[in-house]
Each structure stands twice: as structure tokens, then as C-alpha cells.
């Protein structure tokens, strides 16, 4: 037999094998019984996932419309821009479709997409039937499993310890740290004068709030075990080459990029290869993050062994984590050193990006909607007296529980501009699940399940809730349904209700997930964002900075455009505009 015949035979066998696998996949997808959408590519291809979301609008301008309509729903973050069901033709029809679930079929696999609140609730409740995907380990589990990436009994062990740690002591520490770093970092923006006429125009508000958020997470994460805040002003002590803040920030900012590669590979990246300097820097940051925290954990373990009390002035995550891990009698239920480091990274990376993103949206929303800012200012003035120089202490147990409107503002920001646009799970085995129409759907094992968070947060069930809590000056928009409007008052129940804040129906509000795997840092995030808004509005007002001749309506339209200019890089965030300027004016 000639070489050509051998080659052709092997090629035909390969094609037949691929065709058989594809046909079997189609049969499995059809057996689910939901509408199917075919795309002419592998939607899970690593390079496509990595590059397509960054080049979404470029692809849209280059591709023919018929091809773009097919490929657009394979781009990560498509749910921010497209209808919740691609079978619908109207781009505004995010939630009015009859079928809120469909199957996306590519060349290698298929995905089950849903915006059905009943399905979302069931998937998030059944944590052993629908597990965290392995892909998450490449992003957040470089040092070992943690509470965000583990499954099964391993997850239960992590969850038990982490929930002991992220408690009211941490929430109080976050509240106090938020006030401290707000005063320290925003002193040149939140200026005051005796005649109350101080006003500052700045393009640095986003950057400063990001710096505050990062400082809070480090401070609450490792406490004051060493002077990390001013460390970059000094030469790092050997064997370190980077300040702790710089190492952690470099690692976190690249967690969804080059940091998915092993640190050993990055640290030995060839000098002749492209990106040599960046690769080595990221690799070094990962190595030093691990080294630093191993040292801190060793210090804490030695302190506990000697029976000494903590020297930190506030509760910190790493000390509480070591204490909680060592408190159990069964050593198999404790966390290893690498698992503690992994949980610390998940705590910092997960919190930093999501909280900083929420603060960006919150600032734009404050400037865009003066009605709601006035509504918040009424509450701020009732909680925090105007007298004093602003340095007097504020009590967490007194202030935070009464910040009802401010927390409602935070919740509405998370509803419309939350960092998670989708939640991803894998069916651990064949599963059955009932959709809202009453039909039972059977999902084969290893089905990739995606919950469309954006669509859930725009459901008609959000419409016209708690209008009695609206400010007197509020007027509904004739141009958009209520669920698409930013209306924080929907979160405040009337007096005499069982709960102060509205509790959405199950499966309709999932910015921090839901069920047993709800984000353990949810309360911490709410406390931080709420406290920083209170600090911003304590004596000041935030307004859009207007160009000469620009009206307030023009400025507000510009902010509307900014709110639509979002990007997806693992999480949802505002596209940063270095020229976006705000006026911060003293009001009392």
C-alpha cells in the first residue's frame, strides 16, 4: 500500500471519527428538547475565548451581518449586548422571549443557556449536581484549591473554615478601614473650607477609589503585620524584589491573562521571546505573593503555638484563617499552607476587581442621577452630624444598619451593573430539571450550563416594585419599562414589613450567586461600597464636569453613554476613560 493511500485512509478515519462524535453530540443536544442554535466554530477554543471579547466591536465591523449574528453569541460577555435568546430578532428583547432557555451547539460541544429563574435557582441550589468548572482552577487556584474553585467534600471543608473567618469582625474591620483609607487617599479631592465653597474637578476619582478598595482588601487580608502601605517607598528586603502591594496588584491585574501560565514558566521566559519583561514581572509577582504569605502564615502559626495574642489592631483574614484552620480536632479538616494562600488570593482578587468595578459604576450613577444622590444625602445627613472636622470615629454597629437607602443604592447598582454577567456550572452526571413552563428537561452528563445573569436582572418581575418608597420628585420614564430603570427605592419595603429591604423571588437576583455557594464575601462587599458612598457624600456632592457651553442634559447624555460602554474581561467593568472628569463640591 502506497504512502498516499495510507495517508488518505488515516485522514478518512479521522474525519469519520470526528463526524461520528459531532452527530452523537447533536443527538445528545436534541434530546434535551430545547431550541437549538448552531454556530460554525468551537465556542470553547482557548484563543477565541481569550481574544474575541477584546475585539468584539472590531469583529462586528468586519464580519458580514449573517455571520456576525451567529458568532456574536459565542463571544464571552455577549449577554451584555445581545437578546437573552438569539432566536429573538429584537435587540431590546432581553427577557420577553417565550423561550428563556436554549442550546448553543458548536463544532466540539454544546452549552445550555438559561434566563429562567426557576432553573437558575435549581442549578445554584444543587451544588453536587452542578459543579464549578475546572477552568476556574487556572484562574484562581494556582496555589491549590480554595472555597471558590473546590467541589464536593473538599469544598465543604473550605466553606466551613472560610465562613468562620468572614464574619462580623471582618465586616467591622472593612467598615473602619473604608473610612480610614477614604480620608487618607481622598484628602485632596474631599477638600473643605470654612465658607463651604470648596470644589475640585478631577479625573482621578476612579483611580483613587480603586486604590482605596485595594488598600482595604490588603489591610483586612493581612492586617498590620508589616508596614506594607509605605513599603514601595523603600527597597524591598531580600529575597524580595517587589513591594507586597506591587506584587499582589501585578498578579491580580493579570489573573485573567498571562498569569494563567505557571509561575515557573513565566520566571524562565526566554529573553529573546516577545513580552519577556512583562512575563518575568508577572511570574515574579506570583512567586513573591506565595513567599510573603507563607512567611505570614508561619508567623501566625508560631504565635499561636507560643500562646501569644495577636498584635494586629483589627481582625485580619490571614490570622483568622490560621486560627479557624487549627481550631478543629481533626487535622484532615484543616487547610494546608497552600490552601490558605489560595483562599487569601481568592479573597483579594475576587473582592478587589468586583468591588472596584461596582464603585466605578456607583460614582457615574451618583453624578448621572442627582435625584437619587439627593435621596442618599438626606440619609447621610441624618446619620452623620455636620459638626466636627470629619475625623471623629463612626461606629459600624450604629451607622451601617441604618444606611438603608445607601445599601438600596448598592443593590440596584449590582442589579443593573453587577460584575457577573453569567454563572457557569458543569452537570456532574445526567440531571433532570424543571423549567418555569412546567416542562422537565433532561441534561446529559458534563453539560455546560450558563445562567444569564443580565437577563435575570431585567425580568418583568422587577417591574413596579415598592413605588411607595420613591422620592416625591421621581417620575417614571415613558420610554422604558421600570425594570430597565435605575430606581434604588424598589429595594425599600414599606414601614411595618417583615424585612426592611426587598427580598427578590428566588433565582431573579444572583450578583453574588445564590444557594449554598453564595459568595462568602457578599456582606463584606456591601459594607465596603456602602461605607465609601457614605464617606463621599458626608460633606460633598458629585457632579459631572461640564465643558464650556455644555448643558446639564448634554453631560447626562454623556454619562448615559459611559454606562453603556462596558467591557468583559472575566467580569463586567466600565471602559475606563482617562478624560472623564467629575466635580466634587463641598455642600456642608
Swiss-Prot record:
Induction: Expression is positively regulated by the phomenoic acid biosynthesis cluster-specific transcription regulator C6TF.
Domain of life: Eukaryota
Biased composition (Basic and acidic residues): 467-486
EC number: 1.-.-.-
A molecular function GO annotation: heme binding
InterPro entries with a match to the protein in the record: Cyt_P450, Cyt_P450_CS, Cyt_P450_E_grp-I, Cyt_P450_sf, Cytochrome_P450_monoxygenase
Keyword Signal: yes
Cofactor list: heme
Keywords carried by this UniProt record: Glycoprotein, Heme, Iron, Metal-binding, Monooxygenase, Oxidoreductase, Signal
Chain positions recorded as heme binding sites: 519
Pathways per UniProt: Secondary metabolite biosynthesis
Glycosylation sites noted in the Swiss-Prot or TrEMBL record: 293
Annotated spans, Disordered: 467-490
Top-level EC class as recorded in UniProt: oxidoreductase
Secretion signal span: 1-21
Function, in words: Cytochrome P450 monooxygenase; part of the gene cluster that mediates the biosynthesis of phomenoic acid, a long chain aliphatic carboxylic acid that does not appear to be essential for pathogenicity but may play a role in allowing to outcompete other fungi in the environmental niche via its antifungal properties. The polyketide synthase produces the long methylated aliphatic carboxylic acid chain of phomenoic acid. The cluster-specific cytochrome P450 monooxygenase may then hydroxylate the methyl group of carbon 31.
Family statement drawn from the similarity comment of this UniProt entry: Belongs to the cytochrome P450 family.
Protein name according to UniProt: Phomenoic acid biosynthesis cluster cytochrome P450 monooxygenase
Organism from which the protein derives: Leptosphaeria maculans (strain JN3 / isolate v23.1.3 / race Av1-4-5-6-7-8) (Blackleg fungus)
Amino acid at each position: 500500500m502506497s504512502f498516499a493511500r495510507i495517508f488518505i485512509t488515516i485522514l478518512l478515519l479521522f474525519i469519520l471519527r470526528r463526524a461520528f462524535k459531532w452527530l452523537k453530540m447533536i443527538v445528545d443536544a436534541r434530546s434535551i428538547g430545547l431550541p437549538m442554535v448552531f454556530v460554525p466554530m468551537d465556542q470553547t477554543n482557548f484563543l477565541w475565548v481569550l481574544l474575541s471579547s477584546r475585539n468584539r466591536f472590531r469583529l462586528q465591523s468586519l464580519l458580514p451581518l449573517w455571520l456576525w449574528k451567529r458568532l456574536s453569541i459565542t463571544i464571552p460577555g455577549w449577554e451584555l449586548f445581545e437578546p437573552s435568546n438569539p432566536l429573538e430578532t429584537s435587540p431590546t428583547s432581553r427577557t420577553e422571549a417565550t423561550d428563556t432557555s436554549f442550546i448553543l451547539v458548536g463544532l466540539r460541544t454544546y452549552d445550555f443557556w438559561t434566563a429562567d429563574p426557576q432553573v437558575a435557582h435549581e442549578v445554584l441550589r444543587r451544588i453536587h449536581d452542578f459543579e464549578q468548572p475546572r477552568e476556574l482552577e487556572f484562574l484562581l487556584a494556582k496555589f491549590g484549591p480554595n472555597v471558590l474553585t473546590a467541589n464536593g467534600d473538599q469544598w465543604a471543608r473550605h466553606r466551613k473554615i472560610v465562613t468562620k473567618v468572614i464574619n462580623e469582625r471582618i465586616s467591622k474591620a472593612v467598615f473602619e478601614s473604608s473610612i480610614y483609607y477614604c480620608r487618607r487617599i481622598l484628602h485632596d479631592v474631599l477638600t473643605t473650607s470654612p465658607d463651604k465653597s470648596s470644589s475640585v474637578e478631577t479625573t482621578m476619582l476612579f483611580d483613587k477609589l480603586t486604590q482605596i478598595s485595594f488598600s482595604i482588601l490588603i489591610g483586612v487580608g493581612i492586617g498590620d503585620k508589616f508596614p506594607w502601605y509605605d513599603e514601595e517607598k523603600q527597597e524591598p528586603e531580600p529575597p524580595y524584589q517587589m513591594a507586597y502591594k506591587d506584587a499582589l496588584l501585578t498578579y491580580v491585574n493579570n489573573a485573567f491573562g498571562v498569569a494563567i501560565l505557571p509561575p515557573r514558566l513565566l520566571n524562565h521566559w526566554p529573553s529573546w521571546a516577545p513580552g519577556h519583561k512583562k512575563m518575568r514581572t508577572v511570574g515574579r509577582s506570583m512567586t513573591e505573593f506565595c513567599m510573603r504569605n507563607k512567611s505570614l502564615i508561619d508567623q501566625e502559626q508560631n504565635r499561636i503555638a507560643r500562646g501569644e495574642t495577636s498584635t494586629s489592631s483589627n481582625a485580619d483574614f490571614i490570622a483568622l484563617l490560621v486560627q479557624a484552620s487549627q481550631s478543629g480536632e481533626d487535622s484532615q479538616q484543616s487547610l494546608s499552607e497552600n490552601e490558605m494562600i489560595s483562599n487569601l488570593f481568592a479573597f483579594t482578587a475576587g473582592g478587589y476587581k468586583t468591588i472596584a468595578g461596582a464603585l466605578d459604576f456607583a460614582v457615574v450613577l451618583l453624578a448621572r442621577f442627582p435625584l437619587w444622590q439627593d435621596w442618599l444625602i438626606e440619609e447621610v445627613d441624618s446619620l452623620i452630624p455636620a459638626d466636627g472636622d470629619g475625623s471623629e470615629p463612626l461606629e459600624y454597629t450604629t451607622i451601617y444598619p441604618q444606611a438603608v437607602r445607601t445599601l438600596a443604592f448598592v443593590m440596584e447598582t449590582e442589579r443593573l451593573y453587577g460584575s457577573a454577567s453569567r454563572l457557569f456550572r458543569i452537570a456532574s452526571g445526567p440531571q433532570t430539571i424543571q423549567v418555569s413552563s412546567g416542562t422537565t428537561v433532561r441534561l446529559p452528563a458534563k453539560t455546560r450550563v450558563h445562567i444569564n445573569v443580565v437577563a435575570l436582572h431585567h425580568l418583568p418581575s422587577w417591574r413596579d416594585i415598592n413605588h411607595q418608597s420613591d422620592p416625591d420628585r421621581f417620575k417614571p420614564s415613558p420610554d422604558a419599562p421600570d425594570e430597565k430603570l435605575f430606581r434604588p427605592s424598589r429595594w425599600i419595603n414599606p414601614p411595618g414589613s417583615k424585612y426592611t429591604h426587598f427580598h427578590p423571588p428566588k433565582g431573579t437576583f444572583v450578583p453574588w450567586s445564590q444557594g449554598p455557594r453564595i459568595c462568602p464575601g457578599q456582606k463584606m462587599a456591601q459594607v465596603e461600597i456602602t461605607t465609601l458612598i457614605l464617606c463621599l457624600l458626608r460633606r460633598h456632592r458629585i457632579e459631572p464636569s461640564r465643558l464650556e457651553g455644555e448643558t446639564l442634559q448634554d453631560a447626562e447624555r454623556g454619562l448615559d453613554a459611559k454606562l453603556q460602554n462596558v467591557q468583559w474581561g472575566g467580569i463586567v467593568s466600565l471602559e475606563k476613560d482617562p478624560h472623564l472628569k467629575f466635580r466634587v463640591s463641598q455642600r456642608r
